[in-house]
Swiss-Prot record:
Residues exposed to the Extracellular side: 45-170, 240-264
TM stretches of this protein: 24-44, 171-191, 219-239, 265-285
Biological process, per Gene Ontology: asymmetric cell division; cell septum assembly; positive regulation of sporulation resulting in formation of a cellular spore; regulation of phosphorelay signal transduction system
Subcellular location: Cell membrane; Membrane raft
Disruption phenotype: Cells lacking this gene and ftsE, the previous gene in the operon, delay sporulation onset, as a result of which they form a medial rather than polar septum at the onset of sporulation. This is presumably due to slower phosphorylation and activation of the spo0A transcriptional regulator. However, at later time points these cells undergo polar division and eventually form smaller than wild-type mature spores.
Pfam families in alphabetical order: FtsX, FtsX_ECD
InterPro entries documented for this protein: ABC3_permease_C, FtsX, FtsX_ECD
Protein name from the UniProt record: Cell division protein FtsX
The UniProt record lists the keyword Metal-binding: no
The keyword Membrane appears for this protein: yes
Function noted in UniProt: Part of the ABC transporter FtsEX involved in asymmetric cellular division facilitating the initiation of sporulation. May act as an importer, possibly at the top of a hierarchical cascade leading to the correct temporal initiation of sporulation. Acts upstream of the histidine kinases KinA, KinB and KinC, the RapA phosphatase and the Spo0A sporulation protein.
Alphabetical keyword list: Cell cycle, Cell division, Cell membrane, Membrane, Transmembrane, Transmembrane helix
UniProt organism field: Bacillus subtilis (strain 168)
Length: 296
């Protein structure tokens, strides 16, 4: 078996060498396609990561009525915790709320510092849901509870965020699927030309008794090699470009939800995906292209 496989592998390399221009055309088609797939894959996965981080930061701010005593606050906290889909309920004192308000204004916020004046803000509960998409429904339920002064969660911002996240994910998936099928079509046609040039050889092999799979194996391996060779340049570009992008972007967005996936193991996972896609494209193109030539 190993001997036969070695023979088929040698035949595949010889065929690639004999049909230099066809080999170049096939590898070029795979390379261009995988570069596009790689770019969109990196963008889509990072957008998905940013969207997930942004979703995690969605929270509900429940302002507690000033008339609520400690017992009423404890009851309100327990009532919120008992709601379905609640991940956490954290108490935030009005002093902490004031500090956050001052910090949000930067240097100009220093003028808001209270000296001898009473803090006018409310104590609050910061609520996070297990599923960020449940935020609007949970907020409506909390609004109806006793001793709740006001509920805020950035309604318009949250709705806009979920729409952007959904659209970006769908567009990314659609583009990658479309590019993969385009690549399969291009490789199939390219390999058909290669096989057509060798149709006499295939017919002779068939006439002398060679089985269909014996004939298919060299083309199977040839397609596999074309796909793998075609993934080399895209992988090199992904490795080098992503490293540069991380070094340039990360320091500028540190601390925000706009965070890129870490270089390792992300780029190596993407590299494996590109190799796999290239191999599948090449094998699929070879097997579908040779099918009609086996009907002698």
């Amino acid at each position: 078996m190993i001997k036969i496989l070695g023979r088929h592998l040698r035949e595949s390399f010889k065929s690639l060498g004999r049909n230099t221009w066809m080999t170049f055309a096939s590898i070029s088609a795979v390379t261009v396609t995988l570069i596009l797939v790689g770019v969109f894959l990196v963008i889509m996965l990072n957008l998905n990561n940013m969207a997930t981080n942004a979703e995690k930061q969605v929270e509900i701010k429940v302002l507690i009525d000033l008339t609520a005593d400690q017992k009423a606050q404890d009851k309100l906290q327990n009532d919120i915790k008992e709601l379905k889909g609640i991940q956490s309920v954290t108490f935030s004192s009005k002093e902490k709320e004031l500090d956050q308000l001052v910090d949000s204004f930067g240097d100009s916020g220093k003028s808001l510092t209270m000296k001898d004046q009473e803090n006018p803000l409310n104590d609050a509960f910061v609520v996070k849901t297990t599923d960020p998409h449940d935020t609007p429904n949970v907020a409506k339920k909390i609004e109806k509870m006793d001793h709740v002064y006001k509920v805020t969660y950035g309604k318009e911002e949250v709705s806009r965020l979920f729409k952007v996240v959904g659209v970006s994910r769908n567009i990314g998936i659609a583009l990658i699927i479309g590019l993969v099928f385009t690549a399969m079509f291009l490789i199939s046609n390219t390999i058909k030309i290669t096989i057509f040039a060798r149709r006499k050889e295939i017919e002779i092999m068939k006439l002398v008794g060679a089985t269909n799979w014996f004939i298919r194996w060299p083309f199977f391996l040839e397609g596999l090699l074309l796909g793998v060779f075609g993934s080399v340049i895209p992988i090199a570009l992904v490795l080098s470009t992503y490293q540069y992008v991380i070094g340039w972007v990360v320091p500028k967005v540190q601390g925000s939800f706009v965070s890129l996936l870490p270089y390792n193991p992300f780029v190596f996972q993407v590299s494996l995906v590109l190799i796999a896609i290239g191999a599948v494209i090449g094998v699929w193109g070879s097997l579908t292209s040779i099918r009609k030539f086996l009907r002698v």
